[in-house]
């Protein structure tokens, strides 16, 4: 379900302050996976927490409007079972 248009996009206030005061090339660490990517974020690198570590995410124009958490997967896919013991 989409967010109501009258509410507008969500971004954590502390994150927005960090972005405005950040220097070029600096990785901005954040736990706010739910924050929407704004046009002001383009060209910045965020360290998005996935529950274990910070995943570096470089923001491009195509990412505007999405959430930060979409680009830092929280689950590791181990793959499906092997056929090692199977005889033909």
From Swiss-Prot:
GO annotation terms (biological process): ribosomal small subunit assembly; translation
Top-rank taxon: Bacteria
Recorded GO MF terms: rRNA binding; structural constituent of ribosome
Amino-acid biosynthesis in keyword set: no
Presence of keyword Ribosomal protein: yes
Alphabetized UniProt keyword annotations: Ribonucleoprotein, Ribosomal protein, RNA-binding, rRNA-binding
Cellular component terms (Gene Ontology): cytoplasm; small ribosomal subunit
Protein family membership: Belongs to the universal ribosomal protein uS19 family.
Job of this protein: Protein S19 forms a complex with S13 that binds strongly to the 16S ribosomal RNA.
PANTHER family in alphabetical order: RIBOSOMAL PROTEIN S19P FAMILY MEMBER (PTHR11880), SMALL RIBOSOMAL SUBUNIT PROTEIN US19M (PTHR11880:SF8)
Name of this chain's protein: Small ribosomal subunit protein uS19
């Amino acid at each position: 379900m989409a967010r109501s248009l009258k509410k507008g996009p969500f971004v954590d206030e502390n994150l927005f302050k960090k972005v405005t005061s950040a220097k070029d090339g600096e990785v901005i660490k954040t736990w706010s996976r739910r924050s929407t990517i704004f046009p002001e974020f383009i060209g910045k690198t965020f360290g998005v927490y996935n529950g274990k570590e910070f995943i570096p995410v470089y923001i491009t124009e195509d990412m505007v409007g999405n959430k930060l958490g979409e680009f830092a997967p929280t689950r590791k896919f181990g793959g499906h079972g092997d056929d090692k013991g199977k005889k033909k």
